Amino acid sequence: MATQWEVVIGLETHAQLSTVSKIFSGAPTQFGAEPNTQACPVDLALPGVLPVLNRGAVERAIRFGLAIGSTIAPRSIFARKNYFYPDLPKGYQISQYEIPVVQGGQITIQVPANEKAGKPAYEKTVNLTRAHLEEDAGKSLHEDFAGMTGIDLNRAGTPLLEIVTEPEMRSAAEAVAYAKSLHALVVWLGICDGNMQEGSFRCDANVSVRPVGQEKFGTRAEIKNLNSFRFLEEAINYEVRRQIELIEDGGEVVQETRLYDPDKRETRSMRSKEDAHDYRYFPDPDLMPLVIGQDWIERVQAGMPELPAAIQQRFVEQYGVSAYDAGVLTSSKAMAAYFEAVVAKAGAANAKIAANWLMGDVSSQLNRDGIEIDAIPVSAAQLALVLQRIADGTISNKIAKEIFSAIWDEKATDEAAADRIIDAKGLKQISDTGALEAIIDEVLAANAKSVEEFRAGKEKAFNALIGQAMKATKGKANPQQVNELLKKKLG
């Protein structure tokens, strides 16, 4: 990407709130029901019906606001956002415009290292502009009707919290890191189930470019309804390339709304981008202003869980893990709880190795089986014993992986499964110096060429000899002990 251009990204994220009923009616919000079976007269905009605000939706918005350190508006207004679309029965959407319920706030993100670009991992704080309550629209179904479009109003009126950032992100990597952090937070708080496939969490990305050093923002394009982190990254990267190439070829970027085509991995124009005045916002006369007293905020505060940021800091200070690792370990409540349970059994001295295992072998196995950490077949106590056996020298790290896989595959229920498997398969590390010296002597005799190369100054030859020694012991030798004995014998 051309280094003379700076990327500017702001995200608008729609988080579907986990209420049982809709934001202005008593209709259910269950996903996957038959079309138009979860829409009541309010959702259908039939004459003579009035909206009634769902208290649970408001409390979830307050909970989010408290978590990000925002200001909870003591008085906020619902407004009508006027536009025509077939799946919007009223001809307007009830949203918030001038006075949102959540104002300001910030989220600290951990941006992973980019080894190809030579960029290390770093931390960044993203400021939020606002978060406001609104209702979702229905859904247009194009595939099932030849030449026609079906309208499913089950989703109409589902409560959403639209979360808007300042245009402070400068790369797709930062945008994805923010989206992942936000996703983890709303799920952690219990205000959204975070199911991206069902549309419970989706992002709109506002993307522009400008010459490095220029203060004025470039013309932005909005990419709508990105419902996976991969699509978000691909869409932003494509859009940045498109805009830079367009400008460098003498063209101008048009303010518009675009869609991302994941098959072609490109964005395409959908419609011209509207401004606020196009929607003719005005206060909804059917809804009173939302008044939130301090006592209400305090009641919500009393029910708040320990937040990921606080736990991350505790993990760094108490266990000595890196800030990035702490961020991964708090990606979900279940992951954080599992890590703490492992450390409680294995001891704080083994916290770093526990963190490495959770981010490595454990995550790899979870991905392989397509399950979440709360469904892991290896208990925290079982993994802790594996780590203890590495620490006390009973087994090597390589053998530990074999034991972990065995416990996983057999879905063992006994807490001492690691010891049982070690004994049954004879996997104890060979730490007897005499026995190891005999094996190393055989390895040196059989690999005279490598010995000569090492003595000639080739360090790789030494690694080859270690590999041969480990192979001769079937991975059961203590690697450190092998290293020391080889150095001793090779002088």
Curated annotation (Swiss-Prot):
Family to which the UniProt record says this protein belongs: Belongs to the GatB/GatE family. GatB subfamily.
Q: Name any one GO molecular function.
A: glutaminyl-tRNA synthase (glutamine-hydrolyzing) activity
Top-level division of the source organism's lineage: Bacteria
Q: What class of enzyme is it?
A: ligase
> What is the purpose of this protein?
Allows the formation of correctly charged Asn-tRNA(Asn) or Gln-tRNA(Gln) through the transamidation of misacylated Asp-tRNA(Asn) or Glu-tRNA(Gln) in organisms which lack either or both of asparaginyl-tRNA or glutaminyl-tRNA synthetases. The reaction takes place in the presence of glutamine and ATP through an activated phospho-Asp-tRNA(Asn) or phospho-Glu-tRNA(Gln).
Q: How does it assemble?
A: Heterotrimer of A, B and C subunits.
SMART domains, sorted: GatB_Yqey
Its Enzyme Commission number(s) read: 6.3.5.-
Against Pfam families, the record matches this protein to: GatB_N, GatB_Yqey
Encoding gene, per UniProt annotation: gatB
State the UniProt keywords alphabetically.
Answer: ATP-binding, Ligase, Nucleotide-binding, Protein biosynthesis
Q: What organism is recorded for this protein?
A: Burkholderia ambifaria (strain ATCC BAA-244 / DSM 16087 / CCUG 44356 / LMG 19182 / AMMD)
| Lineage, uppermost ranks | Bacteria, Pseudomonadati, Pseudomonadota, Betaproteobacteria, Burkholderiales
Can you say what this protein is called? Aspartyl/glutamyl-tRNA(Asn/Gln) amidotransferase subunit B
